[in-house]
Every structure is written in structure tokens, then in C-alpha cells.
Regions:
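Acidic, histidine-bearing metal-coordination/catalytic regions of metal-dependent phosphoesterases
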Residues: 1-58, 69
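Solvent-exposed loop/turn segments at secondary-structure junctions
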Residues: 97-99, 127-131, 154, 171-173, ...
């Protein structure tokens, strides 16, 4: 399978940092991390610009599973099945399905695609999804009923009054993401972007709600202060932000790249979106 730019560097980092940390602690860090429950968090989000006809829409927001050594596929599937039992209206996965290789990720994509959500199931890719074989991951996702709106705005729900769902592919910088958001063919109601830096352009375009991941909430935060964390490269790192009538929600992720999360529990999130 093809390997994207950065695969070798990421593989070396994984061996030198992630696995080494686990071995130095005689496997304790890894075992504790894998045993940590993925929380199902419920959040009511008030968004001034949200369509009145979609008040109360419930979104299963999934992000950053990082399938691999630190996230067995069964653990990820169980988290998806748990949130599926809450009967969300829409499923939104904001990337980093895998940590390194796409091999073995199909059961998770199948579980996401099996969620009975009347507004559909959507996925955008993160930086880790591009390391190995992004095209293969997208193909598997689409086979299992996930829609991938990279650079597109798709209609969801009632054909007469659709919810417009847009998505942008992974971008590292504000400039890259500004371009990606600015060229969307329409202004969506909901934007999916792995990197929360897309919110700058989204708010400028008047997109009511943006969902992101990527930051992991720093993985280590101060007790009771989720935004006071180790994600130094991201001012928008955890939870809810607002700019004028537009809102951003950053999921801190179900997985990790390093086997430690402190005061920053792994999560899947059931969002209830209210206008106001």
C-alpha cells in the first residue's frame, strides 16, 4: 500500500517515544491507558446562527480514535456502539481514525456506518489518516455508508429542507484551512474539519457550527480546567468556543498518541444543538 509523506517520521516517533515509554514502565502505562473507559459525554450546545428547523438536532461527535497499539479496534467499536444506542440524528467523525496503518480499521468504519442516524454519517480525514493510505480508508468508509465531504457541501435529512454539511480535508496551517473553507461551493450549516484552526475562516464565512478534533485536549490538563492543557500549538483546544453567531466544538478525542491522559478523559460526545 502507498505511504504518505511523514509515515517514516511518525513510525520512528512511535517507536522511540510511545513504545519506549511503555517499555520503561514495564507496560504499566499502556495497560492503564487501554483499560481507561472512553467517556460518553453529553453536551447541549447553543448556537445563535443554527437553523431554527434543526433545533435540538443530536450529533454523535467522534474523533481521534488512533487505532493501533494504544487503541484496540474492539475498544473503539464498543464506544461507537454505546453512543449509537442513544439514537443520534447524525454521526460526525472528525478524523484520525487510525494512528499509522489503515490495516484493521474496517470494523470501526463498519460500526460507524451501522449507526441508524436519519441525517447520515459523515467523516473527514485527519493528519494521521494520510500517513499510510488515505484513499483506501476513504474507499472503505464509503463502502460502509460514510459520506466524506472533502471540499464539498452535502445535503442531509429532509430533501425539502436539508441540513447542509460541509467538510475540509486535513490542513496544518490557518492559511491552508482558510483557502479550503473559502472555496467551499456553499455556506454549510455544519462544517467538519479535523484541525480547529479552520474555525477562523468558518466564522468569517458565517458557518453556524464547526466540529473539530486533533488537539486531544493536550492529553494532560489542570483539574477542572480543560482548556489549561499541554496543547500549546492550539488556542482552540477543548470544548466550546463562540465567535459572533458561530460556534466551534473541539472533541478531545477517544484515543491518544502517547499512553497518558491526565484530567482529560478520552471521549465520544453526544451534542444536542440548540438555536440561541
Amino acid at each position: 500500500m502507498p505511504r504518505g509523506t511523514g509515515y517514516l517520521r511518525a513510525r520512528i516517533r512511535h517507536l522511540v517515544v510511545t513504545r519506549a515509554a511503555d517499555r520503561l514502565t514495564l507496560g504499566i502505562l499502556g495497560r492503564r491507558h487501554r483499560a481507561q473507559e472512553i467517556a460518553l459525554r453529553e453536551v447541549e450546545l447553543r448556537v445563535p446562527g443554527w437553523p431554527a428547523s434543526r433545533d435540538g438536532l443530536r450529533i454523535a461527535h467522534l474523533s481521534d480514535f488512533h487505532l493501533g497499539d494504544l487503541m484496540p479496534v474492539g475498544r473503539a467499536v464498543e464506544a461507537v456502539e454505546r453512543i449509537a444506542r442513544r439514537r443520534p440524528d447524525l454521526v460526525a467523525c472528525t478524523g484520525d481514525v487510525v494512528d499509522l496503518d489503515v490495516d484493521g480499521c474496517e470494523p470501526l468504519l463498519e460500526a460507524m456506518g451501522a449507526v441508524q442516524a436519519p441525517f447520515g454519517r459523515f467523516l473527514v480525514l485527519g493528519n494521521h489518516d494520510h500517513l499510510h493510505d488515505a484513499a483506501e480508508l476513504v474507499a472503505m468508509a464509503e463502502v460502509h455508508g460514510l459520506r466524506v465531504p472533502h471540499g464539498q457541501v452535502m445535503r442531509a435529512g429532509d430533501a425539502a429542507d436539508p441540513l447542509l454539511v460541509g467538510g475540509v480535508d486535513w490542513g496544518r496551517t490557518v492559511r491552508e484551512l482558510d483557502r479550503a473553507v473559502d472555496v467551499l461551493p456553499a455556506v454549510p450549516d455544519l462544517l467538519l474539519a479535523h484541525n480547529p484552526k479552520a474555525f477562523h475562516a468558518a466564522a468569517r464565512r458565517g458557518i453556524p457550527l464547526t466540529l473539530s478534533g486533533h488537539t486531544h485536549g493536550g492529553q494532560v490538563a489542570f483539574p477542572g480546567r480543560p482548556r489549561a492543557n499541554l496543547s500549546f500549538a492550539h488556542r482552540l483546544s477543548a470544548g466550546h468556543y463562540r465567535r459572533r453567531d458561530c460556534a466551534l466544538f473541539v472533541n478531545v478525542g477517544a484515543g491518544a498518541w502517547f499512553p497518558l491522559r491526565l484530567h482529560c478523559a478520552p471521549e465520544v460526545v453526544l451534542l444536542t444543538v440548540r438555536r440561541g
